[in-house]
Structures are given as structure tokens and as C-alpha cells.
């Protein structure tokens, strides 16, 4: 494991991942999930459909396989739930940006199967396996699967609790 700090590369990669997050979140959460919710479709079905489409956006990524596709679906659920309950794209955009940026340019993992030339840390994994995600990167790992499920459940729990409280509190006019 090595360390190198290259501010220009870090800033450039941050801008790149910001553009990726903006594009994907505006399209998948802002437009597609927003339109599905506007049809009065069940919010969880809308969330699942938009998440499946998000995963399909990545179908041609290098090293794609079943577990990375599952994790991309779960990532879509996490990002979608954060939009669903905050009603604001800033949270999923920020989450998406920092998720990708920290994985690749900071920690040195592949991001959705894509390798980046420069990272702060250089990881030398003993072998590619389902625990470290192999050639797809951390998003291809079982650890990622567990994290996505846990954090999605937490966001849904928080959001449902928040909605229940807001419905129970009478508004004064």
C-alpha cells in the first residue's frame, strides 16, 4: 500500500465524478423516479423500477457480473430512497459523488469496473474475490451488498418515521 497526494488529479477527478453524479441523479432520480411518482404508482415500485434502470445504465461496464449488478440495483435503491424522503436531489448527488470519488481517486479501488490512473492510496489486494469486489471494485463485493441493504433500510425507516410524524402533527392556519 502506497500513498501519494496529487491535488490537481484529486480536483480533476472530483469534477469528473461531480458531472457523473449530476447526470445520473438528474436523469434517474429527478426525471425517471420523479415521473414514476407523478403517475401515482406505489413509491416502492417506482423506486425499484428506477433503480433497475440505474443498474442497466451500467450493463456494459467492464467486469460486470451478477453481484455488481445487484449492488448497482441496491445503490439505486439507496440513492432513490434518499431522494424520495428528502425530496431534494442534493443529497443523492452528494452521496453518489463522494461514494465514487472516495472509492477510486482516494482509496484506489476500481469504480464500477473502471480503473483510474491516479489515486491517493495504492491498494495491493492479495486476490480478487467476492469480499473485495475483484476487478469490478468494491461495488462488486458482498461487503458492499450488506452496506447498501443496511443504509437503504435506515433511510427508509427514517423517512417513513418522518412522514408519520408530519402526518400526525396538525398544521395551524
Predicted regions and their residues:
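Residue-level signature of transmembrane alpha-helical entry/exit and packing/kink sites
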Residues: 9, 13, 43-47, 68, ...
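Membrane-interface helix/loop boundary segments of multi-pass membrane proteins
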Residues: 23-49, 81-88
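Active-site-flanking alpha-helical
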Residues: 27-36, 65, 94-95, 103
Amino acid at each position: 500500500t502506497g500513498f501519494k497526494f496529487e491535488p490537481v488529479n484529486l480536483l480533476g477527478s472530483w469534477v469528473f465524478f461531480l458531472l457523473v453524479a449530476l447526470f445520473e441523479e438528474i436523469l434517474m432520480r429527478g426525471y425517471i423516479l420523479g415521473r414514476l411518482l407523478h403517475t401515482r404508482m406505489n413509491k416502492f415500485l417506482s423506486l425499484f423500477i428506477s433503480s433497475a434502470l440505474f443498474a442497466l445504465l451500467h450493463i456494459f461496464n467492464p467486469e460486470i457480473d451478477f453481484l455488481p449488478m445487484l449492488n448497482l440495483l441496491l445503490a439505486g435503491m439507496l440513492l432513490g430512497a434518499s431522494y424520495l424522503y428528502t425530496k431534494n436531489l442534493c443529497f443523492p448527488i452528494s452521496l453518489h459523488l463522494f461514494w465514487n470519488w472516495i472509492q477510486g481517486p482516494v482509496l484506489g479501488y476500481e469504480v464500477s469496473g473502471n480503473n483510474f490512473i491516479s489515486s491517493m492510496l495504492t491498494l495491493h489486494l492479495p486476490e480478487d474475490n467476492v469480499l473485495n469486489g475483484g476487478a469490478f471494485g468494491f461495488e462488486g463485493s458482498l461487503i458492499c451488498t450488506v452496506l447498501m441493504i443496511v443504509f437503504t433500510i435506515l433511510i427508509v425507516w427514517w423517512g417513513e418515521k418522518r412522514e408519520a410524524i408530519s402526518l400526525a402533527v396538525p398544521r395551524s392556519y
